[in-house]
Amino acid sequence: MGIFAGRSLAADKARQKAFRTAFPSYGPQRSWGGRLLRLCGWGLLLLGAFALVVVIDGWRAFGQGAEGARLERMARSPQWHDGGFENPQPILNNWERTLTDLFHSSPESSPRMPVVVDRIDPKRFATPPEDGLRVTWMGHSSTLVEVDGHRVLTDPVWGERTSPLEWIGPKRWFPAPIALDALPPIDAVVISHDHYDHLDFATIEAMKDWNTTFVVPLGVGAHLEYWGVPADHIVELDWWERTKVKGLEIVCTPARHASGRFLHQNKTLWAGWALVGPQHRVYYSGDTGLFPAMEEIGAKLGPFDLTMIETGQYGAGWPDWHLGPEQAVLAHRLVQGRLFLPVHWGLLTLAYHGWTEPIERSLVAAKHDGVGITAPRPGQDFLALAPPPVERWWPERPWKTAEEAPIVASQIPPKLREGHPALPLLPAPAAVSPQTQAPKPQAGKPPTPPPGTGPAVATPHE
């Protein structure tokens, strides 16, 4: 037995030696190259496992793509080209500048101390606004608009993170000023587009059984239905189309932006909104860069008693995606607004600027241009026709001026900028290299219909 075992051991050693000679990357004497390959293999395996966890965990939050009759209707839109929606003016992306800004982001991009928030007493809604128009800003782009006896929620985001995952992604700085189930009855929920900071899965899922009408751009209804909202509670509109909800006219207006959740990039439309009541009018820009049709919005649907225009989350690397404060003031004038409420700031860190910079620059630009502006605390309501004076509730922190960090949209006719005092705060727009522009619309597509001529779309809740 001992001799047999010894011969077997010797044979094993010989085989191991021959194997190591033939395959030096394996075994205890493998090369550094082999070890690196093995580590890379494990890394790819772990990365794949992480990606699988992300997809599984966030699958429902990613939403659902359009199909069937919904997709056919989308394909008939003048904004639809080559399988997706496009802007009339291509949007500029300067990736080199974006990466540069990433490494020079402001240390003040999020608050160091708790943000001042007004907790909302639900009893306040029992008393209608004296002048017929009252607005409560919840932070970012979420507002409750009470206009001529109707209540409208814009882009409600009550979730903790603007992400498909509950454990990673931009986290809100403070809880919502009021619980969703404490809100009064809502007549309409208006969504501007399907980015996570405007269309929140957790919020919609909590609202799916509400007796309300969801008014959304083309394609967004597929997400809502997938999350349980009844189809007859959803109205989808193209630019310049309109509907009525219990007597309040809601008009879908153009915007210059993009859309996308996971694999669904630019498969749904983005938009702004006009709320047209018997006595008052409100304009909500949604996410947008500057674009010429803003003048047409004002001419066809204005003047507006209140504009709610996005001012934050801008960057020099994406100057056409967001207005920035100075161009927001210009947009307010173009759409013929009376009182300007800056939104899309004060809740999340989604860009590299200081968190107070949007409101600081908005105040400077509004004063320079003679524009009425309001800056309520999150949760604070105000009467749009008699707004309170601006009180600084945010801390004084360092921020960059328009001269230091200008945001200037590309491909804008010079005449659009003429006669607006705030614009000297900005340098002249630089020429856009053709290589940085997105593809132009396909030849032969029908032109966009004239503003204000879009068809009316009926809603079951008129």
Regions from the language model: what does each represent?
Residues 76-77, 167-215, 302-308:
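Active-site metal-binding motif and surrounding structural segment of the metallo-beta-lactamase
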Residues 2-11, 38-44, 213, 228-246, ...:
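Binuclear metal-ion centers of metallo-dependent hydrolases, dominated by the metallo-beta-lactamase
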Residues 158-175, 258-264, 315-321, 349:
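Acidic/histidine-rich helix-loop elements
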Residues 158, 254-277, 393-417:
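Active-site-proximal loop/helix segment associated with metal-binding centers of metalloenzymes
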Residues 2-171, 176-180, 217-286, 305-312, 361-379, 385-386, ...:
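Metallo-beta-lactamase
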